[in-house]
Amino acid sequence: MRKIFNILFACTISLAFVACSDDEPKQPSIFANDLSADSTAFDKWLRTNYSDPYNIRIIYRYQDYETDQTYNVIPAKMENVKALAKMMKHIWIDAYGEVVGQDFIKSYSPRIFQYIGSAEYRSDGAMVLGTAEGGLKITLFRVNAMDIDNIYIDSISPFPNSAAVPIDMNYWFFHTMHHEFLHILQQTKSYPTEFNTVSAGKYHANDWINVKDEEAPLEGFVTGYASGEAREDMAEIYSTYVTHTPEAWEKILKAGEKGGDTSGRDAIEKKLSIIKSYLKESWGFELDDLRKVVLRRSHEVLQMDLKTLD
């Protein structure tokens, strides 16, 4: 499922081989056919932290057959790839492992994560934030926009400025990962059909892109994207809740009130209650426990050395 937001870059790569120097490249190649693939210190770190324990593969070298040829994209920078891989393990994988157990991630995590340096832009100007393919692969874009010297993870602003710099890691990466992971859980174990009825008749199937995030709560949605359909609504509530503080969540609920009308707030709270029950009864964990761990780990990562593999 594509996660798309409103907010061309064209790149043509040609390779020429010229026998004019015996110098070895100073950095690992960004292309997949490099002979050093799977033999660098970082590749060994990935095997130790992702492949061996969880059967998860990180694709960071550019592979054109792994990307949508409709779009022109560029490879991710190595220093940003390493930083994102370390953060993803600490905030995402280890958070679920701490709350639900490592076997949960081993069983249900997507098997492939692909890092792309730039964004994908549709013909209508919309930016593709991330994609998921059948619960097996998640692609994350804009990796090169990360400032690894100034990591920013905003858990207190429910309606962030998407154009702000440094980029918000929650908005651009971790929200998307939790969103897509919830889709895997939905597909594995059916969620209560009652959820679909709460906002029935209010979804914007064809024009959700025109629904502003800050206005969506009045209609009972936590983001504009959530107003597209019930499945996305559920994934947006889940990913928004787990990446924001209770105070930020309350701001969303307050935005669902106008005068004496609390129907927007009521709808969001009703749907959240259904999600919490679903996760506890079908998956054996409390959403509030997961949020506490995610928020704690998001703070911890700000103190981590993201430039080394230690």
Regions found by a protein language model. Give the residues of each.
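Sec-dependent signal peptide recognition
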Residues: 2-10
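Acidic/polar, low-complexity intrinsically disordered N-terminal segments immediately downstream
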Residues: 5, 21-102, 106, 261-263, ...
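Auxiliary, metal-adjacent structural segments of Zn-dependent hydrolase domains
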Residues: 24-25, 82-146
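Second-shell loop/turn segments in exported
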Residues: 70-78, 148, 160-168, 172, ...
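Active-site recognition of the HExxH zinc-binding catalytic motif
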Residues: 140, 154-192, 235
